[in-house]
Structures are given as structure tokens and as C-alpha cells.
Amino acid sequence: MASPGSGFWSFGSEDGSGDPENSGTARAWCQVAQKFTGGIGNKLCALLYGDAEKPAESGGSQPPRTTSRKATCACNQKPCNCPKAEVNYAFLHATDLLPACDGERPTLAFLQDVMDILLQYVVKSFDRSTKVIDFHYPNELLQEYNWELADQPQNLEEILMHCQTTLKYAIKTGHPRYFNQLSTGLDMVGLAADWLTSTANTNMFTYEIAPVFVLLEYVTLKKMREIIGWPGGSGDGIFSPGGAISNMYAMLIARFKMFPEVKEKGMAAVPRLIAFTSEHSHFSLKKGAAALGIGTDSVILIKCDERGKMIPSDLERRILEAKQKGFVPFLVSATAGTTVYGAFDPLLAVADICKKYKIWMHVDAAWGGGLLMSRKHKWKLSGVERANSVTWNPHKMMGVPLQCSALLVREEGLMQSCNQMHASYLFQQDKHYDLSYDTGDKALQCGRHVDVFKLWLMWRAKGTTGFEAHIDKCLELAEYLYNIIKNREGYEMVFDGKPQHTNVCFWYVPPSLRVLDNNEERMSRLSKVAPVIKARMMESGTTMVSYQPLGDKVNFFRMVISNPAATHQDIDFLIEEIERLGQDL
């Protein structure tokens, strides 16, 4: 006999599940009962299940149960079909939602309750009295809840509980006191755009399935190229899954530009290629070289000065060394806003060297690209207009929700030639519209998420001036922090001088270490301070800031600010909290 749910009236089974006491039978009858309107279905379900028979998640402790949606409605229709009518999620499953027959009412109610959960989380994210994180160790979370996937479906009441539980233990990255990563903040327009994008649920490979999004990508990338300084916004570009992939795109295109035959014949057809980047650059350059078969040994790290900027004379020296060995320099990746120090390489000097030796110049402005929106700070990227390609991540300094990373290329058509494969089932050549808007073939991906809409909608809502105010405020907050701690007892700066970006790097020195000479023992003990304070931050949930060693410098705090919700008071709180958590070390 068919199992419950396999047919409209099929509820029994060979194993005795036709017994009215059996929960599987009750669920099957309940699905039929939900076809009735006016609350009758829910009442029948309640009789079938009984309070003791409601499905419950097995294993582990349970979060508080969500209350069933029991709203009143004034439509005066009998029976009532509007979303405000009573819906009891304990007796509903995903199969009762659209596209199920009569699934509109439970669908609207369910999504409204999900929205309520999300909106409560949004409000809490900006509430300074709430924790940034409710930290639990991995084994605690694994033991406390049953996260395993089951063969049988759970009801919608439990699904809502999973939503609540997930957010309960999520990091509030929009919290004004979350300073841990380069991507922070929670923009309301960007959030709304992301919801819309998920609702549209389309792919970016052709105009026919994403007409508006493809046009918005064209408009937005052109505007970004104009801001970089390429005449008329000429060139090409694409949104990618992140800065690491954007940097790999640049490496891929630079290699193709110099040796187009590599596309068909592979690395065996080309000489030993060498890329150059600073010792403070992002690790993604080496990852890209590994993925493309170039090899990490073929990425030469150029020395930096004490502020983390590439030294041009060392770049030229290493280029000449590579050429003397018979290798072929094909790419220099300069960084505009390094991950740790927030340093900006001297782009004009790097551009001169690249021009002299005919090498592709890439600028990794994933972190620093946002400063191009500020008239006060864009000078730090002087020379970016001479680059052949630029990585720019609006999901970092501009506060666009993750993910939103762009790779901009100065030469139009090069990306298409490098990556296109002419898949005839997608990119037919006899379509009835302009095929230049079928942009998917220039991407490495086939399935590509719509990342542009949140940036475009935020830009429309804020204007360029709004982004400028955002950038200027964050840099002012970084300067405020620097001015407070540079001469404050118990703090030592990692490098001298005002930071160029919002990165403020410092050591907190507890009272017990302040009396020690600056020797190996002191450095060894100091290296343990930041990790302990960070652990205490997370366990208390009050704030979060990152730390790391770099070169010969032991663990230090790296404070970054990209959330415009932060204030001077939040900076003051951070300083006081570090001192409170570290004074006994």
C-alpha cells in the first residue's frame, strides 16, 4: 500500500501505520484537513494529533517554541481565506506552502513570521545593550542541539525555531561594537535589495533570464570605471564571488593577454611566468597562482617599508632578476589598502615600472577602493587610473551586504576572449536582441549570483555623496582612536604615524609587563595578551576586534572600522573594555 502522502486519499501502510494512533497517519489526515478553510482544518489537526502527539525535535535541548500564528481578521468573509486567519504551524509542513493547492494563506503567514524574526534581529543588531555574540564552543553547540538532517520532514513550527536558533548564535555583524572584520555593518536598503534578489532567484548569464539585473550590472560597472578614471567609463568588468576570485580573474586575463595560446594549450606552451606583489599583500595572489597552474613559487614578494607600502626600487630589482633568469614577468599586483596595516602602495611609481617593462598592472583595491568615493581621501589611490585591472569590493568599506566584489578591466573584450566557450544551449547567436548583453560567457562561472542589485539600490538611496559621508566618518573614527591611544598609558603603536585607512594597529600592555625591559621575554609574554583578551571579549559578548602577528611583530590588535553605526562612544567603550579584560594579565 502506498505510504502516507503518496496519494490524496492514501493513508495506510503495510507496516501498520494506518493505525489512528500513528503520527504518520495523523500527519497525512492533517494535510487533508488543511484543505478546509475558516480554521476548521486546524481544529481537525488538533484532534488528530493531540497536544502530546505534536512532532518534537529529537535529541538535545530545545529553544523556546514559537507560538502559533493566531491573528484575528476583520474581513467578515465566511469562510476566511486571508493571511491573518489562524495558522497552527505544528500541523503544517513545507508541502502545505505554495505551490501546494490552497497554500497561499499558510505561505503568507509563514513568511510574515520569518520576516518578524528577521526584523527583531535587525533591531537587536543596533541595540548596544545586546551582545555582539552569544559565544559557545563548537562541541557545546553540537551537543546542545540536534543539527543532523533527517529523512522525515519537520513541521513549520520547528522550522521557525531553527530560524530563531540560528540567529541566536550568529554574530551580529551590524552591531556598532563589532570591529572584527573588514566587512561590517547592516545597511537597510542593501538588506532589502538582498531579499528582493533572493525572491527573484535568477542567474546572471543571459539577458533573457535577468534583463534588469544585466542592465544594472552594465550601468554600475561603467560608473565604477568612470570613478577609477578610465575615459568615459570604457572597459569591461564583472561581479565575482569575492576579492580572491577577482584577483584570480586579473591574473588569468593578464596571462591570456601575454600568451593567448595558453587557453587551448595550457602552461606547457608558455615560459615560466612570474608575478610580483608586496609582502603585505593578500594571500589570494598565491592562491590564484596555485589554481591557475602558475605555482606559488612564481609569486615574488616585494619588500615593504615600515608602513607596509611596496618599495618600488625592490620591485624593479626583482623584475630584472627574473628576466636575467629567463623568466617572464607578466603581472604586478599593487595593493590599495592592505589587510593588516591598511597601506596604499605607491601606484604612480609602480605604474611607471610596469610601463617600462611592459607588464600588466593590477591594483587590489578590495579594501581601499571605497576611498575613491571620497574627495578627501581618494588621493591615496593616485595612479589607479593607469592600472590594467582593479579589484574593488563594495561589501567592505562601502557597507554593501556580502557578497559584492567587482573586477574592472581597462581593455574591453579581453575578458570575453579569455573566458568564452560558446555554449550553444545558452549563448545562441541568432537571438532577437543585442547579444552583447549576454555577459555570462566572460565569467568562469555558469551559475552566477545577482550581486549588483544591492549596490545599485544603495547607490540610488545614498547617492555618491552618501557613500562619501560614510567613508569620511569611518576614517574620522579611526583617527579618533589613534589620537586617544597613541600617548595613552598601556598602549604601543605597531607603526609610527597616523593610519592611512581605518586600520589602527596597536599592542595593549598590561600593568605587569610595563615594568619589563623591551627584551625577548617581554615580547614572548606580550604575544599572549591579545589572544586572551580576544577570547574574553567573545565569552562576554561585549565587542570583537581582530589580532594577528606580522613578520617579527608579535600578536597585536588590528582595529578596523567600516560600520557607519559606530560612534566616538563605541570607540571609548572598546578602549575601556580592552583595559578591563586585560588588566590582570
Swiss-Prot record:
Cofactor or coenzyme needed: pyridoxal 5'-phosphate
Please list where the region (Disordered) is annotated: 1-24
Residues annotated as carrying Phosphoserine in the record are 3, 6, 10, 13
The UniProt PTM text for this protein says: Phosphorylated; which does not affect kinetic parameters or subcellular location.
Q: Where in the cell is it found?
A: Cytoplasm, Cytosol; Cytoplasmic vesicle; Presynaptic cell membrane; Golgi apparatus membrane
Q: Which reaction does it catalyse?
A: L-glutamate + H(+) = 4-aminobutanoate + CO2
Q: Under which main EC class is this enzyme filed?
A: lyase
- What Pfam families does the annotation carry? Pyridoxal_deC
Q: What is this protein called?
A: Glutamate decarboxylase 2
Q: Between which residues do disulfide bridges form?
A: none
Subunit-level organization: Homodimer.
The Gene Ontology terms for molecular function here are: glutamate decarboxylase activity; pyridoxal phosphate binding
Source organism per entry reads Sus scrofa (Pig)
What's its job? Catalyzes the production of GABA.
The family note in this entry says: Belongs to the group II decarboxylase family.
Q: Report how it sits in the membrane.
A: Lipid-anchor; Peripheral membrane protein
Please give the InterPro entries that the UniProt record associates with this protein. Answer: PyrdxlP-dep_de-COase, PyrdxlP-dep_Trfase, PyrdxlP-dep_Trfase_major, Pyridoxal-P_BS
Residues annotated as coiled-coil are none
Residues noted as binding substrate in the record, renumbered to the chain: 181-183, 558
The main location is cytoplasm
Specify the superkingdom: Eukaryota
Report if keyword Cell membrane is assigned.
yes
Q: N6-(pyridoxal phosphate)lysine is carried by which residues?
A: 396
GO cellular component, alphabetical, reads: cell projection; cytoplasm; cytoplasmic vesicle; cytosol; Golgi membrane; presynaptic membrane
GO biological process assignments: gamma-aminobutyrate shunt; gamma-aminobutyric acid biosynthetic process
